[in-house]
């Protein structure tokens, strides 16, 4: 059974499965999944998904922007067997091109939870390098849009100073690198 049914109900799942318009399918799915979720500043999480989607220029990009946090963030800690998977997205007919990009940008937890801040940063930087090395333009554009929104000065201003410093340290250099790679890929 598709795990999405646990979160959005069987009727909604069937409606989404049968939708032909890919963008509306993704939009309805995230509207249902993230309706109550808040970001680190206490704002509706959906706003982040919409902003990332709005930065993308193709239909596939806009859909990926909406869906980019579904597998990473829709979890039930006490019941990991209910975590949403990429197969759940395939089941609702999300194209493989989009799923491949989502797989590349979806963070995997570090091997241990007891890493130092520098080890966490190094692990994150390795994930960015993996995205770049994939040469998957959709994934590179998606990660660039996601990081640009997370590193937006307006959003950062709503966070405590410690979080601002962490995000600056985490996003500043990798974002520059991604933008450069994206620009090279587009102009070649």
Locations of regions flagged by a protein language model:
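Active-site helical microenvironments for divalent-metal-assisted chemistry
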Residues: 2-188
């Amino acid at each position: 059974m598709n795990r999405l049914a646990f979160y959005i109900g069987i009727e909604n799942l069937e409606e989404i499965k049968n939708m032909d318009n890919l963008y509306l399918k993704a939009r309805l799915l995230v509207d249902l999944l993230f309706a109550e979720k808040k970001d680190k500043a206490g704002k509706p999480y959906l706003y982040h998904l919409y902003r990332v989607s709005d930065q993308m220029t193709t239909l596939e990009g806009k859909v990926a922007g909406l869906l980019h946090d579904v597998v990473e963030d829709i979890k039930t800690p006490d019941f990991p067997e209910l975590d949403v998977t990429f197969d759940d997205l395939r089941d609702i007919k999300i194209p493989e091109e989009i799923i491949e990009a989502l797989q590349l940008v979806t963070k995997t937890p570090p091997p241990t939870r007891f890493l130092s801040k520098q080890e966490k940063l190094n692990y994150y930087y390795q994930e960015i390098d993996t995205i770049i090395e994939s040469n998957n333009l959709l994934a590179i554009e998606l990660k660039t849009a996601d990081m640009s929104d997370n590193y937006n000065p307006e959003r950062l201003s709503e966070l405590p100073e410690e979080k601002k410093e962490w995000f600056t340290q985490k996003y500043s250099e990798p974002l520059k690198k991604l933008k450069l790679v994206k620009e090279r890929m587009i102009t070649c």
